[in-house]
C-alpha cells in the first residue's frame, strides 16, 4: 500500500523548486557582501606587525570586513580608496578624527594639520613602508569602504583587531567635538 503522505514529484519539478529557492537568496547574499560584511585579504607590509607579520609575504592575512557602520574612532583599522588612485585600496589605522590637530611625522617637516569635519587622519603601523595621511593629508570618510574587525586566517592569529596598539602620541591636540 502506498504511503498517502509521500508525493510523487519528478526530478524536474524538485530541481526547479530548489533553483527558485536558491535564486531568491542571491540578491540578499549580494547585498550583504557589498554593504554589510565580507572577507578580504591584506596585501603589503604597511600595517606590520598588526597584519602580515611574516617576512616571506607568502602567507597573507584574511580578515573580516564590516561595511555597515560609518562611525570611525581612533585605533580603527579601515579599508579606503587611495586619494591618489581611486582604483587602489589601502589598509590604514585611523589616528585622528574630525577637529583633531595632527602632528606629521618625519621625513615631512614638522607641522600641524587640522582634520576637517567628515575626514580622518590615517597611517600605516609600519611608518617606513606606508603611504598615508602624512603624504596626502586628511582623508574624506567617503573614501572608507570598510572597517577591519577580525583576523580570520591564519588560525594561529585569528581574533578581534587590537584597537589600542596604535601610536597614542599621534594626536597633538584633540578637538572639542571629537573627545568621547
UniProtKB/Swiss-Prot annotation:
Signal peptide, first to last residue: none
EC number: 3.4.21.-
Pfam families: Peptidase_S26
Active site residues per record: 46, 92
The keyword Transmembrane appears for this protein: yes
Keyword Transmembrane: yes
Gene3D superfamilies tied to this protein: Umud Fragment, subunit A (2.10.109.10)
Annotated GO biological process: protein processing involved in protein targeting to mitochondrion; signal peptide processing
Predominant place of localization: mitochondrion
Recorded GO MF terms: endopeptidase activity; metalloendopeptidase activity; serine-type endopeptidase activity
GO cellular component, one term: mitochondrial inner membrane peptidase complex
Record key words, sorted: Hydrolase, Membrane, Mitochondrion, Mitochondrion inner membrane, Protease, Transmembrane, Transmembrane helix
Compartments where located: Mitochondrion inner membrane
Regions crossing the membrane: 19-39
Membrane topology: Single-pass membrane protein
Function: Catalyzes the removal of transit peptides required for the targeting of proteins from the mitochondrial matrix, across the inner membrane, into the inter-membrane space.
Family per similarity comment: Belongs to the peptidase S26 family. IMP2 subfamily.
Subunit structure: Heterodimer of 2 subunits, imp1 and imp2.
Name the record gives this protein: Mitochondrial inner membrane protease subunit 2
Lineage: Eukaryota, Fungi, Dikarya, Ascomycota, Taphrinomycotina
